[in-house]
Design a protein with these regions (language model features):
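Residue-level recognition of conserved beta-strand positions in structured domain cores
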Residues: 25-27, 59
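Broad hydrophobic/π-residue packing in well-ordered secondary structure
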Residues: 21, 43, 54-55
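Intrinsically disordered, low-complexity segments enriched in polar/charged residues with Gly/Pro
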Residues: 1-3, 43-45, 88-89
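Short, solvent-exposed secondary-structure boundary/capping segments
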Residues: 32-41
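Mixed-charge, Lys/Arg-rich low-complexity intrinsically disordered regions
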Residues: 1-13, 18-22, 29-32, 103-106
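Intrinsically disordered, low-complexity boundary segments flanking structured domains
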Residues: 12, 41-46
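Generic alpha-helix detector with strongest preference for long hydrophobic helices that associate
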Residues: 4-6, 38, 73
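Intrinsically disordered, low-complexity, charged/polar segments
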Residues: 47-106
Length: 106
């Protein structure tokens, strides 16, 4: 199985294709790297392929903030330029420009 190139980058703001949430990417797995139990808990009719990048998000919806693990096939660019209101944003990123956050320079 070939390693896939990621479509999105760390710091990109994205939204879910099917569910009402958005978030900022803080890590990328170039193939599925979560537990089999987690994978099997997804309804079969919407279960994503494992052979694609999966993204770790600081996510939010209208009610709550949380962390999400989402397949590339289920993400779209969020070009609203609205900030993500997750409490961990400032621990990981140092600023925002347009529809992307950036990490501190070393």
């Amino acid at each position: 199985m070939a390693i896939q190139k990621a479509k999105f980058s760390i710091g990109d703001i994205v939204k879910h294709k099917h569910f009402e949430f958005r978030g900022v990417i803080y890590d990328v797995d170039f193939k599925f790297s979560n537990s089999e139990e987690w994978y099997q808990s997804i309804p079969k009719n919407v279960r994503p392929r494992k052979d694609q990048p999966f993204y770790h998000l600081l996510a939010e919806n209208d009610d709550v903030t949380y962390e999400a693990y989402v397949s590339e096939q289920n993400l779209l660019v969020d070009d609203s330029e609205e900030p993500i209101k997750h409490p961990l944003i400032n621990e990981i990123f140092s600023g925002k420009k347009g529809s992307s956050y950036f990490k501190p320079s070393n």
